[in-house]
Amino acid sequence: MKPQWQQYIQIINQVVKPALGCTEPIAAAYAAAVARTLLPVEPESIAVQVSDNLYKNSMGVYVPGTGKIGLAIAAAAGALAGDAEAGLEVLANVTPEQVTKAQTLIDAGKVKVERTETDEFIYCCVSLTAGEQEAMVKICGGHTLIAEKRLNGELVFTADNAQAKATGSICDGIDINIESIYRFAQEVPFEEIQFILKASELNSKLSDEGMSKPYGLEVGRTMKNGIAAGIIGEDLLNKIVMLTAAASDARMGGANLPAMSNLGSGNQGIAATIPVVITAQCYKVSEEKLARALIMSHLGAIYIKSHYPPLSAFCGNTVTSAAASMAMVYLAGGSFEQSCYAIQNVISDSSGMVCDGAKASCAMKVSTSSSAAVRSFLMALSSQNVSGQGIIAKDVEKTIKNIGKMVLNGMSSTDVTIINIMSE
């Protein structure tokens, strides 16, 4: 296999992985669980410091297995019951009794959460104290990327430069672009990418959960009721929007099921997966072609998002859905050129969507971007595309660079304003 393709598979394995619950509070749970492995006794108090952006994405989302919202319960549950070996599934086996114990610690004022100034978008430092003993774990640059461990002030671990590489830079130094992703997805041996079908399995289960039970705003179930009432039809567009939103409903509503995430985001993993799966069903393609389309969607999303920092003011579901739309064109038998049209169309359609934290209404944003993906892939199949208008360049690679510039140079103050509004 080509060395370049091996790099692509390594990238996917690194950042497309199961995650139980919204990844920002789960980062605190994971840090707390790792810190607990250093402390010889159960903690009596917990201190959590996080970046503004991690704070923003933890304020309104349920922590799975707890039925509660926020960083305090995430850190307390992680410290008292988390599995430090489970990564983003750290809280998979938390019991109601352990949640009660964690809440007791919070009610006693023993769990403190505060924002801290840092240049990192993803930053979390958790300190556990018991008597005179203290264990500290610092996460920086990625949701499970441990930068430092200390016990009683003594450094016991520090990440080397390679380990400390931020997820936003994951494609640095790698020969990658939309065309190389497209060719890779088409030509790589099936057995090398068969693992990506796990994304279909996990995220489809979340969708089923969101359709069968009331989570969050019930965006998916509301659409189902509309179909049953004859108000809207069960066509491809509505089916994709309904089932994608349902998975996000369950995800943000605290369902105790993992999502296959994409670059640290469960919702974006859902947005990269469900529209592709439903389109594959519509066109009755083989399992192999579905796997190739999922690779195209997930790696395409990773590549586009590598042009700007994680947890910015820009909602990443937009560009994730652009990559999904590219894969949908492929499933429908379209050309590479038409796949590029799909990316251009989605970004033109919904690139103004901002991120104001992780919460139940993220399911609405997922539904919006997924709807854009369907419209855009249908337009692309008719060779209709946005080109040379606004931030959309004539070339898809230039458009992607423009998105990076817009977020990096134009949305920093937007991010600060959003966080300040949310903190009022």
UniProtKB/Swiss-Prot annotation:
Highest taxon listed in the record's lineage: Bacteria
GO terms of molecular function: L-cysteine desulfhydrase activity
Pfam families assigned to the protein according to its UniProt record, in alphabetical order: SDH_alpha
GO biological process, one term: L-cysteine catabolic process to pyruvate
Family: Belongs to the UPF0597 family.
HAMAP family per UniProt: UPF0597 (MF_01845)
This protein's name: UPF0597 protein Shewmr4_2793
